[in-house]
């Protein structure tokens, strides 16, 4: 076996016999996005040649990597056999519809909500303004903002059976409790409409109600598991202050409210992410707003989607100190395991949301007089720098969990807090999907046997 084949096998953690021309990116579980970046870094080290984005896209098959190692220019991926359609595993690079909500330029690191830069919104807007922008299409004037805020305030109260359900789930993980209670709202809400009959106006009303109720579910469950009754925030509190008041059971500091407001804004939407896609698929089935958001919450709790935010805190505790960061990263890479808080399917540079969350962590760390967590995460980011050139840069999950911990909130609330902000985007995407709806039904390429004879002996 050639040295490049050995490099591929060693980097991906597979037997050398599995390194064949038929193997390509995403065709085996070991050659996922992280495995591909690890391969590019290993090839750079072995051959002393920098691998740019264009070459990274070309080196997606064993045959192309063999050509590269032999000093020839690899072709742009294999052509699909005539009798088989091209397969896009993970739907990577597939554009399935159009949107007017969120624009992402992954190369330049740009994120815009309906044309407004995330940097301007995070610095100057309230979450209510951004939610209005998402759902109703424009930033509100004073009168529109007042009406919208009143809608959110009126939606906070939870039905008694849903509160009872949250109490009975005090032992459960907050994401599991949230998913279950959101689903229950469809049965106990004020308006019960079958999804196939739900009008745009009814869907919007339900969406606003969910935007008001979801943080109260998270807060009620947190209160019950801590042996206290839920606290209903005063009507005149902002959305961010209401969220934090309900969670803490007391009035928060202005600095804490400012962070929550900023965190909700940067989490509000991210185009066709996995959970938003799930919500659109459910909407395409005419499942209704509540069912679509229940599906989104379920997807969001997955460990490689929203669930990564909580796992970053496990990483922080395992690393322990800045001095151990480099060795920790090397250990994970050696085992072919991802480093939580790094890498994104879209961005080829740093996630534009990161700077806002890190700035908050800096401020909170200084306020608390404890910068150890920040220094450790920064050291991990430095250790990951060889991978950042290949798209595995810091993402939105890296600093969010530490900020919540500095506010005195447990690590397992990182995902529910992310969900609270993302609800605005889910509602907007469900409404956009509903306005020009279509059943989303892609195909699978069958690879099994054909024309197998059946006899009773097969049973």
Question: Predicted segments — roles?
Answer:
Residues 1-80:
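Phosphopantetheine-dependent thiolation modules in NRPS/PKS and related acyl-activating systems
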Residues 78-459:
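Hydrophobic alpha-helical bundle cores within soluble ligand-binding/oligomerization subdomains
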